[in-house]
Amino acid sequence: MSPVSGDTYKLLTVNSAFMPFIWKAGIPLQETSKHKHKKNGFTGQLGFVMAAAGSAVGVGNLWRFPYLAAKDGGGLFILIYLILTFTFGFTLLTSDIAIGRKTGKNSINAYQEMRPKWKFLGILTFLVPVLIMTYYAVIGGWITRYIAVYLTGQGQAAAQDSFFTDFITSPGQSALYAVLFMLFTAWIVFNGVEKGIEKYSRVLMPIMLVMIIAIAIFAMTLKHTDADGVTRTGLQGLAVYLTPSFKGLTLRRLLQILLDAMSQIFFSLSVSMGIMITYGSYVKKDVDINASVHQIEFFDTGVALLAGMMIIPTIFVFEGVEGMSAGPGLMFVSLPKVFASMPHLGRIAGLAFFIMAAFAALTSCVSVLETITANCMEIFHTKRKRTTIVLTVLYAVISVVIALGYSIFYVELPLPNGSIGQILDLMDYISNSFMMPFISMLSAILIGWVVGPDWVIEEVEFGGRKFPLRKLYAVMIRYIVPVIMFVLFLQSTGILSL
C-alpha cells in the first residue's frame, strides 16, 4: 500500500494552541479603536478574481478531478460537475464572499457580527486553515522536489516505482523541501495583500493557465505503440475523457457520482475554510460580487477541465485505461513514468508540469496562510510582518514533524471512513472530510434560517448591482445545501456507506 492515501493531495493536528489565547482573560474578538488598523485590500475586481482563483485552483484540480472523471463515467461526471458547480458551488462561494465584504472582518469576527451566539462557527471555520497549514507546505515540498529532479535531468530515476516512497521516507530531504516551500509562501504573505498576494497572483495565474493549455495541446499530439503492438493516441484518450459512459450505471452508482462531484466542488472552491471570507473582506464595495463569483468558477472549472485534457490522454497513450485508476499516486508515480516514456521531450514536459503544479500549490498555500495571519492580526492586534514571521517559524516546525510522519514518526492510523493513513492523512481527514462539510451545513442554516437569505442578497446587490440568480440562491441556501452537506458529512465520516 502506498504511504499516501485519501485526499492527501488536496492542498489542502488541530493546532489548538491558538484557542486558549482567544478565550483567556476575555480577549475581545472585535477590534478596539485603540488597536484598529487600516485594512488593506485588493485594488479592484481583477486582482480579487486572480487571488481567489489562485486559492481555488490547487493540486486537487490537477489529479483529483481527472481521476474522478476517469472513475465516474467521463463525460457523465463532467456534466454533473458543471451543473453542480453553477448551483451548489455558486451558492457557497457567494455566501462566503458576501459575508466577508459585508462585515469587513475575517471568519471569527464575521460570524460573531452576523449573530453573537454563532461566533463558535467562526472559530470552527478558523480551525480549518489552521489544520490544513500543518501539511500544505509538505505537499508543496514534494512538488518542489520533482522540479529539482527534472531540472537536474533525473527524470528516469523519478520513473522508478520506489522513487517517491524513497523520497518521502528520507527524513532530511522531505523536511528540507517542506521548509523551503513554507518560506516561499511566507514571503508572499509577508508583503501584504496588494504588494504580495495580488501582485504574485496576477503573474502566476496567467502563466499557469498558459502552461496547462500548452501541455493539454501537447497531450493531444501524443502517439504510442506498446509491446503488444497496440497503438493509442492522445485524441483517443480525449474521447475516453469526454464521452459519457453509462456502463454499469445504477441508482446507487449515480448517487456516488453525485457525491464525488459535490465533494470535488466543495474542496476545490476553498469554501467553508474562512479563505473566501477573508478575501471577501478585502473586496471594495464597487466590485460586482455576482460577476466575480462566476469568473472564479469559470477559471477554477476551466483549469480542472484542462487538467483532464492534459492528464487523461497522456496516461491513456502510454498506460491504457488501467493507468487512469492510480488515484493519488497519479501525480507523483504514474506521470513520471509517462514522462520517461517520451523520447526527447520527457524532461521538458515533466519540468513544465511540476512548475505548473507548484504555481497551483503556492497560490493555494498562500491563501491558507493569509487567512490564519489575518485572523491572528485581528485577535492579537499585531502587525502583519511580525505575525507572519511567528506563524512561519511555527508552521515550519510543524511541517517538519508532518514530513517526518513517513519516516521517524511513521504510524498507521485507522480513519473513520475505513482507510488507513499517516499523520498527514489524519490532518487532511479532520479538516477536509469532517470539519468542512459540517461547517458548510451550519453556515447554510445560519444564512438560510437565522439571518435570512436577504442578508447576503442585499450585499450582492449593493450599489444597484444585478443578481439574476437571487431566487435560486435563496432556495439553495435554505433547502438544498444543508441537506447535501449533511449527506456528504455522513458519507465522508463513514456513517453512510454506498
PLM region descriptions:
Residues K36-K39, L68-D72, K105-L124, A137-G196, ...:
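Inter-helical loop and helix-membrane interface segments of multi-pass membrane transporters/permeases
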Residues N15-W63, L92-I97, R101-E113, K119-F120, ...:
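Membrane-interface "cap" regions at the ends of multi-pass membrane proteins
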Residues G44-L82, I275, A291-H294, F298-T301:
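Transmembrane helix-boundary motif of multi-pass solute transporters/channels
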